[in-house]
Amino acid sequence: MNYNDPLEPAMIITKVLSKSDIVGNVVLPKAEVMSVLTRMNVNDQDLLNGVEVQVDDIMEDDLYTVTLKVSGIDKPKYYFGTGWSTMKHSLDLSEGDVLKLYWSHLDNKFVVLNFQYSVLPLMIPV
């Protein structure tokens, strides 16, 4: 991913975390996930079984593997299952925090966009 290129808004998932997201699995906003799915090359059956995806925290240089799943057919709910617990604790997320993820289709992974506490270092050639 070239971090100098503008981000595609349709590839961003934003979620204000609820108590149930912190205690259990995080349910992701349906419309935003469906937009990202257009670039993920997965089908409904894949999601019912669960698809392992990587989530890259470029600020801390951490890479997480989480399972993206869907439950229900008539009213689908998209969520992170396995791996979410490790990720939320490592990112020190709590109720009311905003989780912001960008799907980098070129790298085939999510990138954490929670930069509010850090500043990206400038790369100055020497």
Swiss-Prot record:
Keywords: DNA-binding, Nucleus, Transcription, Transcription regulation. Residues 20-118 bind DNA. GO terms for molecular function: DNA binding. It comes from the Eukaryota. Signal peptide: none annotated. The keyword Transcription applies. It is found in: Nucleus. GO terms for cellular component: nucleus. InterPro entries: B3_DNA-bd, B3_domain, DNA-bd_pseudobarrel_sf. This is B3 domain-containing protein At5g54067. It comes from Arabidopsis thaliana (Mouse-ear cress). The lineage of its organism: Eukaryota, Viridiplantae, Streptophyta, Embryophyta, Tracheophyta.
